[in-house]
Amino acid sequence: MAAARCWRPLLRGPRLSLHTAANAAATATETTCQDVAATPVARYPPIVASMTADSKAARLRRIERWQATVHAAESVDEKLRILTKMQFMKYMVYPQTFALNADRWYQYFTKTVFLSGLPPPPAEPEPEPEPEPEPALDLAALRAVACDCLLQEHFYLRRRRRVHRYEESEVISLPFLDQLVSTLVGLLSPHNPALAAAALDYRCPVHFYWVRGEEIIPRGHRRGRIDDLRYQIDDKPNNQIRISKQLAEFVPLDYSVPIEIPTIKCKPDKLPLFKRQYENHIFVGSKTADPCCYGHTQFHLLPDKLRRERLLRQNCADQIEVVFRANAIASLFAWTGAQAMYQGFWSEADVTRPFVSQAVITDGKYFSFFCYQLNTLALTTQADQNNPRKNICWGTQSKPLYETIEDNDVKGFNDDVLLQIVHFLLNRPKEEKSQLLEN
């Protein structure tokens, strides 16, 4: 027999009408809004990425904090210390290298465009009447001085033993270049007041450290991460002239060059370049307190392993001019870049005025002339995204200073090469109009 079901009546209270319920809801809303308005709004710090997290946002925040530290540096020495403090593996860029087509690689590393020929001379203001005109150049005297310097090392100086071919650069060409530069600077000082107060260095080191491009770390505990490509140039010109005022620019700072920079898609290891880890250096040839902190002209002497005769024996005639161009691009970029950083500029605070320097590359007989204008230091991947500026290098083909030396006679002396050296040394800083009137 089925159990009997018991139904109990459900007692319900009195319900509210729709009008009453709507009024109650409106009153509750007004009360809530008044409470929220009366409560002070909490001000929380902005949500930023962690400084120690392994993410892109955290990496960008660490970079921004480091850049803010550099911007806040009170002096140039402090800024250089922060920029060169962290030591990582970096590529060693050698200005004088036997690598094939090194000039194209160096153009990419330094964001430099190479233009054949020398730049046009800057437009000079109308000269004011001077009470005492400058003395005219005596080409015959300059030619005699250059010939005496050649004969001093090739004929007059009696050595105890015969100089081998692989020793000519160090034993003969190096003292000849020293004597030629010092003599010409002394003779041309009356024509160029900047030379009289300039500093002439012999075998003074020049260093520059910079970042260009990125790579994915292939191995190690940081495998797969994105890292910067770092470069270091340790140069040692034979002679260099430093002045207290900056040379005049050849072209405007934002001059648009129609030539594209060679793009290298391979890693620098293929050049080949090798990585080392040691202290990062940025050095122009003197300390930051030296008043002669601007470059005028460098003189570089090629080693015997890069001499023209040796390259011809190796069937590398097409690499003769490449050696000159690569040396000029790397050396002048390092020198002008160090000058710019001595003035407080760096990759995140790009230059506001161009920096200009000149170079003479020689093997003792053949001379090549180059002019360099640094227009940008923003070479990192982040800084170079919207940067149309390019560094510019002008250069000439190498020409012989003389044909041969027989006994006590220099045959086939080339006056054009000597005049070009003189023209480089006579280049002076651009003076303001007020200074011209005072003089």
UniProtKB/Swiss-Prot annotation:
Heart, skeletal muscle, kidney and liver. Lower expression in placenta and peripheral blood leukocytes. Keywords: Mitochondrion, Ribonucleoprotein, Ribosomal protein. The keyword Mitochondrion applies. InterPro entries: Ribosomal_mL37/mL65, Ribosomal_mL65. It comes from the Eukaryota. It is found in: Mitochondrion. GO terms for biological process: apoptotic process; mitochondrial translation. GO terms for molecular function: RNA binding; structural constituent of ribosome. Its main location: mitochondrion. The keyword Ribosomal protein applies. Belongs to the mitochondrion-specific ribosomal protein mL65 family. Component of the mitochondrial large ribosomal subunit (mt-LSU). Mature mammalian 55S mitochondrial ribosomes consist of a small (28S) and a large (39S) subunit. The 28S small subunit contains a 12S ribosomal RNA (12S mt-rRNA) and 30 different proteins. The 39S large subunit contains a 16S rRNA (16S mt-rRNA), a copy of mitochondrial valine transfer RNA (mt-tRNA(Val)), which plays an integral structural role, and 52 different proteins. mL65 forms a heterodimer with mL37. PANTHER family: LARGE RIBOSOMAL SUBUNIT PROTEIN ML65, MITOCHONDRIAL 28S RIBOSOMAL PROTEIN S30/P52 PRO-APOTOTIC PROTEIN. This is Large ribosomal subunit protein mL65. It comes from Homo sapiens. The lineage of its organism: Eukaryota, Metazoa, Chordata, Craniata, Vertebrata. The gene is MRPS30.
